[in-house]
Amino acid sequence: MKKRLCAVLLASPLLFSAAVFADDAQQLRDKLIGTASLKADFKQTVTDVNKKVIQTGSGIFALAYPNQFYWHLTQPDESQIVADGKDLWIYNPFAEEVVIMDFAEAINASPIALLVHRDDATWSQYSVTKQQDCYEIKPKAIDSGILSVKVCFKNAQLANFNVADDKGNLSQFDLSNQQAITDKDKALFSFVLPDNVDVDDQRRKTAH
């Protein structure tokens, strides 16, 4: 009887921790669902392992359910990422190249795509820990260069997020001028292929 009681006491902290993490994940999902759509300006600051600023930038960020995402870095070098709900388009104007991927591959590449994803099976691959008004998302199996994503809210509104990679770099994104997506803004999630660019189509050929 004593051995059984001891085993229960030892297991209790583990069960409690799992329940807390599950609650944290659900809280984050509820907050994101409450943010059905969002458009904002962003400022980007990247620091290296020594906390030295190695890059700054700015641009426009937008998201909408389901699986729609828009990222336009305007300074210092332009780049664009668009998820239309099915495919992911990555455009590098300087290189005159467009890469096309399945949206599922974006999820695999970075937890940041969870901001617009509701699939239970996908969320189960990540652990979520609440830290005051922030939530840290970590992949349970590290198979990409992204170690964690932290998203922070202010007055129930997404305020900033950061991405930590396996090289010790931290990319911080601070949002401003947040507003809901308008009918006009919905065009942001439809990528128009520019003329005279190289196209690297990495989508599953069986699906297209």
UniProtKB/Swiss-Prot annotation:
UniProt xrefs under InterPro entries: LolA/LolB/LppX (IPR029046), OM_lipoprot_carrier_LolA-like (IPR004564), OM_lipoprot_carrier_LolA_Pbac (IPR018323)
Entry's localization field: Periplasm
Keywords on record: Chaperone, Periplasm, Protein transport, Signal, Transport
Xref: Pfam families: LolA
Signal peptide span: 1-22
Plastid as UniProt keyword: no
Top-level taxon of origin: Bacteria
GO BP term, pick one: lipoprotein transport
Record-level GO cellular component terms: outer membrane-bounded periplasmic space
SUBUNIT field: Monomer.
Protein purpose: Participates in the translocation of lipoproteins from the inner membrane to the outer membrane. Only forms a complex with a lipoprotein if the residue after the N-terminal Cys is not an aspartate (The Asp acts as a targeting signal to indicate that the lipoprotein should stay in the inner membrane).
HAMAP family with a match to the protein in the record: LolA (MF_00240)
The family this protein is said to belong to: Belongs to the LolA family.
Protein name from the UniProt record: Outer-membrane lipoprotein carrier protein
